[in-house]
C-alpha cells in the first residue's frame, strides 16, 4: 500500500476559478469528509481518467458549496499487482486541491488478474483514514467486480481482511458507502447492494461513464442537503440527460438517515 497525506486549502481553487453560478453554500461549520474509491484494473481505469479530466469541475463545485470539505482517494487493483504497481494507493483526507490533482495524475493502471478485485483492501484502507469528528462522512466506491471472498474463498483475501467486517466497521463510524456499479455482473450487484445497506448508503448502477463526475458531486450535495439545488443547476445548464436524471432520482428518493 502506498499512502500520501497532507492538508492545505481546497477552497483556494474556488477563489481562483470564481464561479458566480456556484450552488448554495452550507453553514461555515459544516464539515464533509468524502473518499473517492476506484477500481483501476483494465477498462475501469478509464473512469478514473474521466475524473482526472474533470477534476477542476468536481473540486470547484464541492469546495464552493462546502468550504470545509476534505477529499481522499483510494485506488485499488488486486494482489497480483503488488510487485508491479500496487494493491492499494491511498491519499488521506485533505483540502489541498493540488495534492489531490497530483495524486490522481500519478495513479497507474493495474492488471487485476482474476475477476474479483481487492475491494476488501480498499475498504480496510478507508477505515484507516483521518475522519474528522463531527463531519458528514461518505465513501464512494466505483467498480465492476466483487471483493474476494464472495465468489472465491476467503483465503483469497491475502492480507486477512474481510469485506463484510470492514464494511461494518465503516458503518459504525457513521461512514455511508455509496456503491457505484459499472456493468451488470450479478455478484457485484449483490455485494455492492449489501455494502450500501450495511452503512445506510445507496447502491447505484452507472449506465454512462460521462455521468460519473456529476454523480460524485451530487452525492456530496446530498450529504449536506443541497441535492435539489445542484439538480436545478444541471437543468439550467442543460446538463441533465436521462441517465443522469435517473441517478439523481435514486439519490433524491432515498431518505436521509
Task: Please give the residue ranges for each predicted region.
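Divalent cation-coordinating acidic motifs and surrounding scaffolds
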Residues: 2-257
